[in-house]
């Protein structure tokens, strides 16, 4: 009896971990003119209020995580600069 309860609780715990995954929201923009590219952030630490630094075709922006996959977190790195990006 106790092993069945333990198995059910373990299954519920694993299920809640899987369901609680968070992602950057999918961008509705598929392309952007280079002159409109801007980075508001390069890493999550640049964002406030629990938002993440997410990559879009028009640059990196702070977005609140969602439970739907499809978006992409900004890679950051030394070459990332905030502000308008000029090529």
UniProtKB/Swiss-Prot annotation:
It comes from Lycosa singoriensis (Wolf spider). It is found in: Secreted. The lineage of its organism: Eukaryota, Metazoa, Ecdysozoa, Arthropoda, Chelicerata. Residues 21-66 form the WAP domain. GO terms for biological process: defense response to bacterium. It comes from the Eukaryota. Its main location: secreted. One of its GO terms (cellular component) is extracellular region. Has antibacterial activity. This is U15-lycotoxin-Ls1h. The keyword Protein transport does not apply. Expressed by the venom gland. InterPro entries: Elafin-like_sf. Contains 5 disulfide bonds. The keyword Secreted applies. GO terms for molecular function: toxin activity. Keywords: Antibiotic, Antimicrobial, Disulfide bond, Secreted, Signal, Toxin. Residues 1-20 form the signal peptide. Belongs to the venom protein 11 family. 01 (wap-1) subfamily. Disulfide bonds join 24-54, 32-58, 41-53, 42-80, 47-62.
């Amino acid at each position: 009896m106790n092993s069945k309860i333990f198995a059910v609780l373990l299954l519920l715990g694993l299920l809640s971990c899987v369901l609680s995954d968070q992602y950057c929201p999918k961008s509705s923009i598929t392309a952007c003119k280079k002159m409109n590219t801007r980075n508001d952030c390069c890493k999550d630490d640049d964002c406030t209020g629990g938002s993440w630094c997410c990559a879009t075709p028009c640059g990196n922006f702070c977005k609140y995580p969602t439970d739907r996959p499809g978006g992409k977190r900004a890679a950051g790195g030394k070459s990332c600069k905030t502000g308008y990006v000029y090529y």
